């Protein structure tokens, strides 16, 4: 029989663990909710307001001219993005309902791989027309900079998916009875 001091410490430790679990679960739910909100905002903006991705020029008479930076190829990429965003929203809703470590990690890996596919397709299709920028140097540099940035994002996402996968495997190996 543990002494009263040890028993109190064990009970206090148990409460701290429960508090921590409750906070982290609440934090994850907040994160899932923020992800859902952000994905819905992106879905709406990039589906219905893409024409505002443009170069704006103020004319001498005070009027504003909007020159689109997107080509018609944007509409070849848009279904890929919309599909990914809808999958992400659905996955985050599912993770709010069912929140287990292994499940969460698998879903995050899948979503990250989907992100790599979306970014890789964006680089491949490259639906941008930077010729509307009035600076010749910027017109030459911007496509290169955007391509490099998107490749870095895709590689970063890929590394993130690989790290999550390795952590998941290590966690599962530690839990399996030997």
Outline where the language-model segments fall.
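Short, membrane-exposed interhelical loops at transmembrane-helix boundaries
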Residues: 132-147
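Alpha-helical membrane-embedded segments
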Residues: 147-164
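Cytosolic juxtamembrane helix at the C-terminal end of the final transmembrane segment
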Residues: 2, 159-178
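Transmembrane alpha-helix entry/boundary detector in multi-pass membrane proteins
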Residues: 59-82
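Membrane-helix interface motif
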Residues: 44-63, 120-133
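Loop-to-transmembrane helix junctions at the membrane interface
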Residues: 88-119
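Canonical alpha-helical transmembrane segments of integral membrane proteins
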Residues: 34-50, 86, 115-118
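N-terminal juxtamembrane cytosolic/stromal segments of multi-pass membrane proteins
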Residues: 1-37
């Amino acid at each position: 029989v543990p002494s009263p001091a040890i028993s109190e410490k064990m009970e206090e430790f148990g409460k701290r663990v429960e508090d921590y679990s409750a906070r982290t679960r609440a934090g994850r739910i907040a994160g899932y909710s923020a992800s859902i909100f952000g994905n819905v905002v992106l879905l709406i903006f990039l589906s219905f307001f893409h024409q505002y991705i443009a170069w704006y020029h103020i004319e001498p008479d005070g009027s504003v001219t909007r020159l689109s930076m997107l080509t018609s190829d944007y509409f070849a990429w848009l279904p890929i993005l919309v599909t990914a965003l809808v999958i992400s929203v659905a996955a985050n809703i599912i993770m709010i309902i069912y929140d287990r470590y292994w499940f969460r990690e698998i879903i995050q890996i899948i979503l990250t791989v989907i992100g790599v596919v979306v970014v890789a397709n964006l680089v491949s299709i490259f639906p941008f027309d930077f010729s509307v920028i009035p600076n010749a140097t910027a017109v030459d540099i911007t496509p290169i900079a955007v391509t490099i940035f998107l490749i870095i994002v895709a590689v970063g996402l890929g590394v993130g998916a690989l790290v999550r996968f390795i952590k998941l495997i290590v966690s599962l190996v530690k839990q399996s009875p030997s």
